Amino acid sequence: MFYLKGVCRLNQNKTIGIVGYEIGNPQISDDKLCSTEGMKVLRFTEPVNALEHFKMNRNDYALIISDLRMPVINGMQLLKTIKDLNPSTRTVLTTDFDYDSKLIQDYTKKQIINGMLQKPIQPHELVTEVDKQIDIIKSTNKK
């Protein structure tokens, strides 16, 4: 099994939000992502529902992982709105497209997108990226 390392040491921001259909597939289950106490994983298939929940709980989120292609709001629009509401929330965009797009590069430079995952996503790749983002949060919180 894959576990997030050291997540229980976070004093705040204890929620990981996963938005999209394919990211929420059973292959990448919550127990592989987060069985360390102190963290929870919330999954949303609809980006509008995810955004509404985030607006009400913006200080609880450590990380949002979003698919690029979704109905109503695409992943880049969602992550930009997330960053506008809480710039300290880490963000990861997933896509099955080549991410050499100028807009994706621009969003990455501006720290709107903090990480990228190319589909198909293997469970260990997701866990590694989540660990990386959590480590950044922990090092930022120490400052």
PLM features: residue spans?
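C-terminal output helix
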Residues: 118-130, 134
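Receiver (REC) domain active-site loop signature in two-component systems and cognate sites
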Residues: 70
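Hydrophobic/aromatic residues positioned on beta-strands within the core alpha/beta folds
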Residues: 94-96
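Acidic, metal-coordinating helix/loop segments flanking the phosphotransfer/catalytic sites
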Residues: 43-63
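The C-terminal output helix
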Residues: 131-143
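Two-component/phosphorelay signaling modules centered on CheY-like receiver
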Residues: 23-43, 110
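Active-site residues of response regulator receiver
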Residues: 67
